[in-house]
Amino acid sequence: MAQNLKDLAGRLPAGPRGMGTALKLLLGAGAVAYGVRESVFTVEGGHRAIFFNRIGGVQQDTILAEGLHFRIPWFQYPIIYDIRARPRKISSPTGSKDLQMVNISLRVLSRPNAQELPSMYQRLGLDYEERVLPSIVNEVLKSVVAKFNASQLITQRAQVSLLIRRELTERAKDFSLILDDVAITELSFSREYTAAVEAKQVAQQEAQRAQFLVEKAKQEQRQKIVQAEGEAEAAKMLGEALSKNPGYIKLRKIRAAQNISKTIATSQNRIYLTADNLVLNLQDESFTRGSDSLIKGKK
């Protein structure tokens, strides 16, 4: 650029001596400004830069942090990396230990190791994610999922996720990648296996319901037996009481009449009942004889 400006100045027609000096100063200032602009660059927040020079290649010992930096124009130029963690979703069909097809998806939060950027650039370039992540994720998923049955992938999902995270983190270190988080976002099976699992669950629910009905019937049967035994015992005791003292039935009538009269007394309606309606007839000779015998028996 500076050489072009000098050539342009040489082709200009000669003028007054002062004008030529001013033009040379102007061209010199332009060349200096261009050189300064090309010598300065900025590394933004969350980024790192490395130098590539045209003689020695990538400088292994230079990793530039955020801020303003200088370089030698044409001889050096910066290569800037974004070192912030970025999410990526990767899906992979694989097979379980019992030969069931499993569709599994992972969310991987990854970033480059800032201390190894020069070697990463030499091996992988700037598109390191596309070159590395899909292949190592598929490799680890197939290795881990093959250790579990399809049912275990559901019941032991936390353990499966932990094992995938551990192996994938170690595998990524070989490519200067740091994984901040690995999580299973989707886990699905083939239609045939899903239908078989649903049918099994329905059968288990029906078996549990049948077992519940059987247990309920047994409980009801036991309850009826206990109730029948209680009624038989009560009838037996009542028969013994009547055989020993016929006045017992009269006493039951009195208690029944008391309950009836108490109910009528608390009612807002006025009701008139005869002694017969009260299950109590004081003029009944059998009642009098039974009551007297009851009183004598108590004495």
Swiss-Prot record:
Gene that produces this protein: PHB2
Function summary: Protein with pleiotropic attributes mediated in a cell-compartment- and tissue-specific manner, which include the plasma membrane-associated cell signaling functions, mitochondrial chaperone, and transcriptional co-regulator of transcription factors and sex steroid hormones in the nucleus.
GO cellular component, one term: cytoplasm
Protein family according to the UniProt entry: Belongs to the prohibitin family.
Keyword Acetylation part of the UniProt annotation: yes
Induction trigger: Expression increases approximately 3-fold upon entry into G1 phase compared to other phases of the cell cycle. Also induced following inhibition of mitochondrial protein synthesis by thiamphenicol.
Segments of this protein annotated with the region Necessary for transcriptional repression: 19-49, 150-174
UniProt effect for mutating Y77K: No effect on interaction with MAP1LC3B
Tissues and organs where the protein is expressed, per its UniProt entry: Expressed in myoblasts.
Subcellular location: Mitochondrion inner membrane; Cytoplasm; Nucleus; Cell membrane
Any Pfam family the entry gives: Band_7
Source organism phylogeny: Eukaryota, Metazoa, Chordata, Craniata, Vertebrata
Protein name: Prohibitin-2
Comment field on protein domains: LC3-interaction region (LIR) is required for interaction with MAP1LC3B/LC3-II and for Parkin-mediated mitophagy.
UniProt KW keywords: Acetylation, Cell membrane, Coiled coil, Cytoplasm, Host-virus interaction, Membrane, Mitochondrion, Mitochondrion inner membrane, Nucleus, Phosphoprotein, Receptor, Repressor, Transcription, Transcription regulation
CDD domains named among the record's database cross-references: SPFH_prohibitin (cd03401)
Cystine crosslinks: none
Key word Nucleus present: yes
Gene3D superfamilies: Band 7 domain
Phosphotyrosine PTM positions: Y128
UniProt modified residues of type N6-acetyllysine: K147, K200, K236, K250, K262
GO MF annotations, alphabetized: amide binding; identical protein binding; nuclear estrogen receptor binding; protein heterodimerization activity; protein homodimerization activity; sphingolipid binding
Subunit: The mitochondrial prohibitin complex consists of two subunits (PHB1 and PHB2), assembled into a membrane-associated ring-shaped supercomplex of approximately 1 mDa. Interacts with ESR1, HDAC1 and HDAC5. Interacts with ZNF703. Interacts with STOML2. Interacts with ARFGEF3. Interacts with SPHK2. Interacts with COX4I1; the interaction associates PHB2 with COX. Interacts with MAP1LC3B (membrane-bound form LC3-II); the interaction is direct and upon mitochondrial depolarization and proteasome-dependent outer membrane rupture. Interacts with IGFBP6 (via C-terminal domain). Interacts with CLPB. (Microbial infection) Interacts with SARS coronavirus/SARS-CoV nsp2 protein.
Ranges in a coiled coil: 190-238
